[in-house]
Amino acid sequence: PLCSTPLYHELGHFVDFSKGISELAILNYRSVNQGTLPIPKGPQGIVEWATLPDFIWLNHCKEFFADLFSAQFVGKSGVEFLYKLAGSHPASDTHPSTENRIKIVNDFLNNVKNPVVDMFNAVISALHKQGKIISPSLTLPLNLLDVKTTFDNVRPFVINNHNEMHAFINSSWQYLCTEWENPTGIWKGLSKESIEKTINDLVEKSIRNVMILEKWSAQ
């Protein structure tokens, strides 16, 4: 289940496409404040947005929105998964640099003022006023849950309701990363593959317990 974290990012692309968020952003912010988005630094060095075609700006905008959409539910787990899977990459025609993607998500999560976050909030607010989007702005994720106590004892975590599901995924990913880097307790001496498999199994069992309880309650 933890490997499904990138699906939050992909869902962000769907929301963006269906609501026209990036298309509205390019109309209003492409030529503002040197392009608003972080100026890309590719193999040839830093270039100005004014010298680049619109499709590159739009591609970068879509990726930043999908990252922020994901962060609303699973915090920094989305971009951390990206970093661990693909490493740090410079900007390309299709994607911003990994460094800038992580920075924007971290700024959002830490309430640090960021022009990209401000841009999306302004666009979302405009669409909200038109009745096209329910939320008036990007929203911070729920606080992390204490999965450590149960996972340290190799037991499934009790998820109280659906609202906790996203926070549970986020918390479980953070727990997995911690035990990967510095195994403690029962995880000491195990390979990263064994740690990942066991924690993923615990996550799956935790989610399945919720599904079973709901099914029984509906009968």
Regions found by a protein language model. Name each.
Residues 10-27, 73-78:
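Catalytic Zn2+-binding segment of zinc metalloproteases
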Residues 11, 15, 73, 85-86, ...:
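Generic structural signal for hydrophobic core residues of well-folded globular domains
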Residues 16, 70-74, 176, 210:
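Generic helix-packing signal
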Residues 41-102:
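Metalloprotease/metallohydrolase-associated module, dominated by Zn2+-dependent proteases
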Residues 1-4, 96-219:
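Non-catalytic terminal regions of proteins
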Residues 17-55:
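Post-HEXXH active-site segment of zinc metalloproteases
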Residues 1-7, 54-57:
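Short pre-active-site segment immediately N-terminal to the catalytic Zn-binding motif
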